[in-house]
Regions:
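Alpha-helical transmembrane segments and their helix-start/interface "positive-inside/aromatic belt" motifs
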Residues: 1-16, 55-60, 92-109, 241-244
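Alpha-helical transmembrane segments of multi-pass membrane proteins
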Residues: 16-35, 67-75, 115-120
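Membrane-interfacial helical/loop segments at transmembrane boundaries in membrane proteins
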Residues: 30-46, 126-138, 212, 217
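Membrane-interface segments at the starts/ends of alpha-helical transmembrane spans
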Residues: 41-58, 137-147
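Alpha-helical transmembrane segments of polytopic membrane proteins
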Residues: 51-63, 216-223
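Membrane-water interface of transmembrane alpha-helices
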Residues: 66-82, 161-168
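Juxtamembrane helix-loop-helix connectors linking adjacent transmembrane helices
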Residues: 78-153, 168-177
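Transmembrane helix-loop-helix hairpins at the membrane interface
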Residues: 140-264
Length: 264
C-alpha cells in the first residue's frame, strides 16, 4: 500500500472530477448565454478565454474541497468509493466496480423514470416558449458533458463531499455516544444533500426561463430531489460508483426521451 493513501485517494478522485469539469468546455457558452431571455437592448457579454477559465476554475476549487472532505471523513462514517480504494491499495478494481453495476443501473432507471414523470406533469404548466428554451438548452449540452460533469463531478461534490460531511456533522453533534452513525443520520443527510442538489439547479433554470414560476420550481426541486434520494441511498449502501453509474444512466435516459419527444 502507498505510504500516503489519502494523497492517492485525493488525486484519483480529483482527477476524475476534473475530467468532468473540463468536459464543460465542450459546451458552446455563447449559444448558451444567447438562450437567456434579456430585456431589449441589453448587451450580451462576449465569452472570452478568461470567462471560460473562470467557468473551469470555480468548480475546480469546490471539487478540491469536496474531495478533500470526503477523503478525510468517508471512512470514519462508513462511506466509501470501492473503485478508488482498489486503485489506492493496488487491488483488482473491476470486482469492486462490478458489484456496483446492477444497483447503479436499477437506480438510474428509477431516477430517470421519476424525472420523466415530474417532467410530464410540469410540461402541462409551462408555456410553449419555455418548453422550447428548455429543449434548446438540452441540445447544447453534449452527451460527454452530461455523463462526465453530471455523473462524475456532481456526485463527487454532492455525495462524496456534501453528504459525507453532513453525516459526520450530524453524528458528532447529536449522536456522540454512538460508535458510528445510525440509520437516521444517513437518512437525514441524504434528504439534506438531495435538497441542496435540487436547489443548486434553480439559478440556471431561473435564468433560462426568465422568471421564478411555481411550475419551474416544482419540476426542478422535485425531479432533482427524487434522483438525489436514489443517489444518496446508492452511495450509502453500495458505494460512490453506484451513484455515479446511476447518474450517468439518468442522462442517457433523458437524452433518449428528449430525442423521442417525450422530454424537454
Amino acid at each position: 500500500m502507498s505510504r500516503h493513501p489519502n494523497a492517492r485517494r485525493f488525486l484519483i478522485l480529483f482527477i476524475l472530477g476534473l475530467i468532468g469539469i473540463l468536459s464543460f468546455l465542450l459546451v458552446d457558452l455563447s449559444a448558451l448565454v444567447a438562450l437567456f431571455p434579456v430585456p431589449p437592448g441589453t448587451q450580451i457579454p462576449q465569452i472570452t478565454p478568461f470567462v471560460k477559465l473562470l467557468a473551469v476554475l470555480q468548480p475546480a476549487v469546490l471539487l478540491a474541497l469536496a474531495v478533500f472532505g470526503g477523503v478525510m471523513l468517508a471512512q470514519r462514517v462508513g462511506l466509501s468509493s470501492p473503485f478508488a480504494e482498489a486503485l489506492v491499495t493496488r487491488e483488482p478494481a473491476w470486482p469492486r466496480l462490478r458489484n456496483q453495476l446492477l444497483p447503479g443501473v436499477v437506480g438510474g432507471a428509477i431516477g430517470g423514470a421519476a424525472i420523466l414523470a415530474f417532467g410530464a406533469i410540469s410540461k402541462s404548466m409551462l408555456t410553449a416558449d419555455v418548453i422550447q428554451r428548455l429543449h434548446e438548452f438540452g441540445k447544447l449540452l453534449p452527451l460527454p458533458t452530461r455523463l462526465l460533469y453530471g455523473g462524475l463531478t456532481e456526485e463527487l461534490l454532492l455525495r462524496w463531499g456534501l453528504m459525507t460531511f453532513l453525516v459526520w456533522v450530524i453524528w458528532r453533534l447529536f449522536q456522540r455516544r454512538q460508535t458510528k452513525p445510525t440509520t437516521v443520520t444517513f437518512v437525514v443527510a441524504i434528504l439534506l444533500s438531495s435538497l441542496v442538489f435540487a436547489i443548486g439547479h434553480l439559478p440556471i433554470a431561473f435564468m433560462l426561463v426568465g422568471e421564478r414560476t411555481f411550475s419551474i420550481i416544482f419540476f426542478v426541486v422535485l425531479a432533482n430531489s427524487a434522483f438525489g434520494l436514489v443517489a444518496g441511498y446508492l452511495y450509502w449502501k453500495y458505494g460512490l460508483e453506484s451513484a455515479i453509474i446511476a447518474h450517468m444512466l439518468v442522462h442517457v435516459v433523458l437524452v433518449v426521451a428528449s430525442n423521442a419527444g417525450a422530454y424537454f
